[in-house]
Amino acid sequence: TAQYKAGGTEMPAEMGINMNYAEIKYCDIANGPGVRTSLFVSGCTHHCPGCFNEIAWDFEYGKPFTQETIDAILASLEPGYIAGLTLLGGEPFEYANQQGLLPLLQQTKSRFPQKNIWCFTGYLFDKDICGQMCEKWDVTREMLSYIDVLVDGKFMQELKSLNLKFKGSSNQRTILVQESLAKGSPVLLF
C-alpha cells in the first residue's frame, strides 16, 4: 500500500491520499467568525437542490489533498489575526473525506490549540454523526474531538434566508461540539 507521511509519521494511503479538494480560501470571512482559512473538500452525496457549490459534489473534482496541502493550510493559520479553520465542501463527513481530513485536524490542533475549527455538514449531528457514524467508524469520533463548532443539516432551498448567521437555511443548527458531546445532546451556539 502507498504510504502517506503526516507530521513525521508514516500512515496508510487510506488515511488521506485518496481525497480531493475543490478550493482553499485564505482570509475568508464568510464561513465562521473572524478571518479564517476555509477548505472546500470534494465529494458529496447529499446533492441538495440549490447548493452553492454543486461542482464539489464529484469526489474526483479538484486537486489531490496531500501533506503539502496540509502544510500550506497550517502556514496560513500562523498569523495571529487568523481565527481558525473551516471545513466545508462538498461534504467533510463523507467517510473518504473523514479519513483525508483527520491528519489536518490533528496537526491543526497540535500546532494551534487556540484556533477554533468549524465544520459544515449536511448530516445531522445527533442522528447521523453521533447516532450512526460514530458507531461504525472510529475516525468519526476522533474527527469530532478536534471540531469546535458544527453547522449541521442539509441546505433546504425552501428555508433559505440571507439573514442567517453562517448558514444557508433555517433548518441548519450551529452546534458547540465539545459541549454537546459532554452533555450527550446538541448544545447550540446560536
Give the positions of each predicted feature.
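Classical nucleotidyltransferase
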Residues: 136, 141-190
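Conserved Radical SAM active-site core
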Residues: 17-22, 35, 53-133, 138, ...
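N-terminal [4Fe-4S]-dependent radical SAM core
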Residues: 12-40, 53-59, 186-190
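Flexible, glycine-rich phosphate/dinucleotide-binding loops
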Residues: 30, 126, 183
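Cysteine-centered iron-sulfur cluster-binding motifs in ferredoxin-type domains/subunits
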Residues: 36-51, 91
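Gly/Ser/Thr-rich beta-alpha loop segments that engage phosphate groups in nucleotides
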Residues: 45, 91-92, 124, 155, ...
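N-terminal amphipathic/basic-hydrophobic helices that include classical n-h-c signal peptides
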Residues: 1-16
